[in-house]
Amino acid sequence: MKFVLLFGVLLVTLFSYSSAEMLDDFDQADEDELLSLIEKEEARKDCIPKHHECTSNKHGCCRGHSFKYKCQCTTVVTQSGEETERCFCGTPPHHEAAELVVGFGKKIFG
C-alpha cells in the first residue's frame, strides 16, 4: 500500500510539473504572437491605402486581399503646361485577374 501511495504522489508531481512547463511554453508563444501582430499593425498604419498618392514613397503601398498594391504612375499636364508625374496605389490588372479567378474557383469548389 505504501508503494502505491508513493508511486501516486510521484506521478501527480511529475504530471503537475510537466503541465506547468507546457503552460509556460503556451504563454510565451502567445506573447510572441501578440508582439508579432502588434508589429504588423504598426507597419499597416504606416502604409499608403489604395487610391491614395504614393509619388513620394513608391514602395509604401498597403496589402490588398491577396497581393500588395503597386504604385502606378501617370504623367499629368498641369494648367501651366508643365508635365508632372502623379502616382497612386492600386491593383495591377494581372493581380485583379488572378483575384477574379481565385474568387470564381472558390465559388465553384466551395
Swiss-Prot record:
GO terms for cellular component: extracellular region. Its main location: secreted. It comes from the Eukaryota. Residues 1-20 form the signal peptide. It holds the Pfam family Toxin_35. Disulfide bonds join C47-C62, C54-C71, C61-C89, C73-C87. Expressed by the venom gland. Residues 21-44 form a propeptide. The keyword Manganese does not apply. Keywords: Disulfide bond, Knottin, Secreted, Signal, Toxin. It is found in: Secreted. GO terms for molecular function: toxin activity. InterPro entries: Spider_toxin_CSTX_knottin (IPR019553), Spider_toxin_CSTX_Knottin_CS (IPR011142). The presence of a 'disulfide through disulfide knot' structurally defines this protein as a knottin. Belongs to the neurotoxin 19 (CSTX) family. 03 subfamily. This is U1-lycotoxin-Ls1mm. It comes from Lycosa singoriensis. The lineage of its organism: Eukaryota, Metazoa, Ecdysozoa, Arthropoda, Chelicerata.
